[in-house]
C-alpha cells in the first residue's frame, strides 16, 4: 500500500482502480439488463428483480435482497447520480485502502445499510420497496472522511470540508425529499466510517 499523506505521489491520481471500475460496470450492466426486460421505475417489476422489501427479507428470509438491492436503480437518473459520485470518490478510497479492503467497505456498508433500513421500516410499519447503491456510497464517504482526517484534512484531491459538505447536503436533501431512504444513508455512512478507521494503515 502506498502512502497517501501530504507527500503522496502525484501520479497516484491516475492509477487504475479496478474494483471501483468493476462495481460501476456491474451497476450499469444490471440496469441495462433490467431496462431490456421491463420498466425500472415500476415497483412491482423491481421487487421481482431483487429490490429490498422488509417483509420479504425478514418474514420470508430472502436475505439475498440485502445485496441485490444495492445493484439495482429506479430509473436512469438514479443510476447516473450514484455512479457519478462513486466514480469521483470511490477510486480515492480504493487507492488508500487497497482493492480487498475497499471491496469490504463497499459491500459491508451496502448490505449493512440495507439491513438497518429493513429493520427500521419494519419498526415504523412502512412498506416501501427500495434499491440503489447510495448506502454503499455513503459508506465510502464515511471511510474517506475518517482517512482524510487522519491525513491532516487532505487526501489526494479531497479534503474533509468537501466530504462533510457532500454528506450534509445529501442527508438534508433526503430529509426534505420524499422517497429517500435516509436510514440507509446514515447507517451506511456510520458503517463506512467505522471500517475506514479499522482498516486504514498510514505508512510513515
Give names to the regions the model predicted:
Residues 2-204:
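A detector for small-residue-rich transmembrane helices and their helix-helix packing motifs
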Amino acid at each position: 500500500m502506498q502512502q497517501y499523506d501530504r507527500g503522496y505521489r502525484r501520479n497516484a491520481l491516475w492509477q487504475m482502480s479496478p474494483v471501483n471500475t468493476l462495481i460501476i460496470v456491474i451497476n450499469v450492466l444490471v440496469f441495462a439488463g433490467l431496462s431490456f426486460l421491463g420498466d425500472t421505475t415500476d415497483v412491482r417489476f423491481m421487487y421481482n428483480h431483487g429490490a429490498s422489501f422488509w417483509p420479504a427479507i425478514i418474514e420470508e428470509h430472502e436475505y439475498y435482497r440485502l445485496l441485490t438491492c444495492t445493484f439495482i436503480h429506479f430509473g436512469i437518473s438514479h443510476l447516473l447520480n450514484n455512479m457519478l459520485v462513486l466514480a469521483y470518490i470511490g477510486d480515492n478510497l480504493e487507492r488508500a485502502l487497497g482493492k480487498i479492503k475497499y471491496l469490504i467497505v463497499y459491500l459491508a456498508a451496502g448490505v449493512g445499510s440495507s439491513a438497518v433500513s429493513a429493520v427500521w421500516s419494519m419498526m415504523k410499519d412502512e412498506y416501501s420497496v427500495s434499491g440503489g447503491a447510495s448506502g454503499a456510497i455513503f459508506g465510502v464517504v464515511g471511510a474517506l472522511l475518517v482517512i482524510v482526517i487522519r491525513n491532516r484534512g487532505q487526501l489526494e484531491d479531497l479534503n474533509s470540508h468537501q466530504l462533510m459538505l457532500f454528506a450534509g447536503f445529501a442527508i438534508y436533501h433526503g430529509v426534505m425529499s420524499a422517497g429517500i431512504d435516509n436510514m440507509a444513508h446514515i447507517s451506511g455512512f456510520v458503517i463506512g466510517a467505522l471500517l475506514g478507521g479499522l482498516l486504514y494503515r498510514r505508512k510513515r
